[in-house]
């Protein structure tokens, strides 16, 4: 049915008897409307925040408090009281390079109203997993001289900070990360800890801690307050920032803001591309609110000298920055996830593939195929951008391997010039070699058209959109379609750039 032409004017034309019915879903009370996003401000956040104030503990107290936590974890009596102790131990983290604590400070007067003085629940927290298999101990337990109190205190607080990751991670994460936790403690502090080497957990035990964090808003508030304090206080060149980055920041920041997180990751690799241009390349009709929110973040929050509360605010209220969540931007999320997988170095395990996000896995196969096409198109736009920008960022080998010469600025007329000369002759070049074959889920291999109009591609880079023509029917005997010049010339001005290609 793709060959049927749909006139432009019919898509917005109402039937005569329905002209006054212009309501959209959000304007019909009984419709299944989305939960509205809450506008983020620090003032709005503080009205919802309560946290436990953490005070300094000496080394022997840290050791004795940890012993009590271990007893409760082992006995299955772990409660909010023990969870509070875990938070206190975590945020008594010692600085790795000098004396003092990373997180302990006098709470400023504009935050003191959020300190809780309520009594803490002592009811045991239920486990949500039944697996009682112990995590592997990969380091030998030290023998000989007993571990000194200072080293033990450092190791306990370091471990408790890692346990705070359960705010956003599953118990299996701690099980598999325990080896790297031991290794990084050694590299940061220049010490080996018998306590840290000997520690073991089960998923069942860790699930109680995770369930406690999810149950008690005071725990989440405490984690939020001290993490945002450290992120706001320490610069990236500070050694305290480094230890916090490993233990907490990289895991907790931008939680639930998948769209923004993946855009930043991609921009790090495509460092010559401005964020506004990247958004122009990847936006779609359903992403309007996400684009507005990203502009809001860039303009008001994600800049030097601004409190970092916004990065962790969804721990307090998950309706903050809701418009950049994956569920509200499934197509853009899938597009960015694929681009991240192909161009951004990934971790290991469950987090090695950003396409494992649940909403992407649930996408229809046909929609995934369209995403794959758009991914290839964005990659081609990026390569063209590097070359057409006329900078030295695209080296000789890079440009030659893509069959394109570095352009003389005179060759590429400006967008305004092109519009002023609609009848000028267009210059066509074939990509040599042609673009890489795109592997689709139905295992058919089809190619995007290798014929491009340089001027219209330049317009596309600037955000000018062309009408997309219906795709041709593919002969059963061929898996490769090359557009005829007549079809390419159908659009006004003599050029059609059809990103579908099949």
From Swiss-Prot:
Subcellular localization is given as: Virion; Host cytoplasm
InterPro entries (UniProt xref):
Rhabdo_ncap_2 (IPR004902)
Cellular component terms, GO, for this chain's entry? helical viral capsid; host cell cytoplasm; ribonucleoprotein complex; viral nucleocapsid
Q: Which UniProt keywords apply?
A: Capsid protein, Helical capsid protein, Host cytoplasm, Ribonucleoprotein, RNA-binding, Superantigen, Viral nucleoprotein, Virion
Q: Where is this region: Disordered?
A: 415-445
Alphabetically, the GO molecular function entries are: RNA binding
Membership in a protein family: Belongs to the nucleorhabdovirus nucleocapsid protein family.
**Self-association or partners: how does it assemble?**
Homomultimerizes to form the nucleocapsid. Binds to viral genomic RNA.
Q: What does this protein do?
A: Encapsidates the genome, protecting it from nucleases. If expressed without protein P it binds non-specifically RNA and therefore can bind it's own mRNA. Interaction with protein P abolishes any non-specific RNA binding, and prevents phosphorylation. The soluble N-P complex encapsidates specifically the genomic RNA, with protein N protecting the genome like a pearl necklace. The encapsidated genomic RNA is termed the nucleocapsid (NC) and serves as template for viral transcription and replication. Protein N binds protein P in the NC through a different interaction, and can be phosphorylated.
* UniProt protein name: Nucleoprotein
